[in-house]
Amino acid sequence: MKKYLIILCSLCHYHSVWAQQGNYVLLQPNDGYKGIISKAAHVVPSPRQLRRQQLEITGFFHFGTNTFTGREWGTGKEDPKIFNPTALDANQWVQIAKDAGIKQVILTAKHHDGFCLWPTKTSNHSVAASPWKKGKGDVVKDVSRACKKYGIGFGIYLSPWDMNAAMYGSDAYNDFFVQQLTELLSNYGRIDEVWFDGANGEGPNGKKQVYDFDRWYKLIRELQPTATIAIMGPDVRWVGTETGYGRETEWSVVPTNNLNIASITEGSQKNLAFKPQGDMTGSDLGSRDKIINAKGLVWYPAETDVSIRPGWFYHEEENDKVKTPEKLLDIYFNSVGRNGVLLLNIPPDKEGLINNSDIAALKKWKQLRDNIFKKNFAKNAILESSNGINAGLILDNNDATHFTTTGNDTTAIIEIQLKTKATFNVLQLQENIRMGQRIEKFALEYWDGKAWIMAAQGTSIGFKRLLKFSTVIAVKLRLKILSSRLNPCLAEFGLYFMKV
């Protein structure tokens, strides 16, 4: 599922709401360097962004006519009669996802070929024209109900590009798309996420479409106000690759440089969408060098997406190419463990079931994670901070509480005396992002009986940071916060052991 790099950050329409929540701030010419850093430290996620970050792992179900043609991208000319999953079981999909630790799933309700997995009133190119359940089936309903049954979130992917729609490339298509979006947002209960990608190819008439994103966002906020709008939307950005690997330094607070500041300040509703200047897929998005010349700053966290297979749709010939549990674990460390949310695609097969190869990999992946994180060797440790308060809160297993420094200190040292000597090689850190993302550099050292030895070091933390390092046996350690934007707000600290 390749994306055209048209990463659209449509943020200004809901600025008035964001301003109250603190996930957006305007920068003024007289702010100065310290003022800008202070403002950056106070940008925080909206409630919907916080809820989504706490999910950590979400799932994708790519399913449609491509499943039956062997394609990744269809043509829009597929005969709906080819869609006939003989054993479709959405409960199986969702249960397998939940058992793997996935907290929310997204279904491709319509991919670029235009085939709709629900009986839409807008087009004949849908499940209603297929032999599946004699045209009475509704995949969106099945998955929605399964998510409710198993207690996980449900989201929809709706491709703006539609190779089948005759009016694509005209103003009428935006009306058509709004009708489809309205059906999905109105008839299937709570929708937790709407996922748009940036593909914008030609329709049947050879024309491309000017997407009315501002209108779509307004509709989503009206009909499903708690839903996040991802990728081509204001709440979540694409990390920039489909490998599952995030940046070493991942800031959720990033610049926006082409706002009409006056219009936003006055609450104008005329400019509902804008494209940010700069590359949202670059290697550095939120460092001091990047934010210092910005016009505004916004909380715009990263999503890291990858498929469990080489392709996004199911292909039988890829059954022996499913990612290994060990590879999935490495992806987890480099996505969730780098301040991102992992979106893992698990495509159902032609029968309408998750393949056994995928199931086996997912089960073992969950076991590997459970084995690592079942015991925090720092639990019940004695903590002493050089210049802060509530150091013990970093061991309370609550990401809403935190240690912070006194006065204006932006650095700190927390000494950790374990109950007994322990063997560990994984560090987990979390900030209380309700207070913003602040920590810029940290280091973990252990006492070998003679001197302090470096075990691990890193830059940004955000919601979660995981670092693997050479195995250490120690009883005394110290965590050094070396740089922070204002007072650091460290929520959690953990030491774990991973078999290598």
State where each predicted segment sits.
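Extracellular Ig-like/FN3 beta-sandwich strand-entry sites
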Residues: 472-474
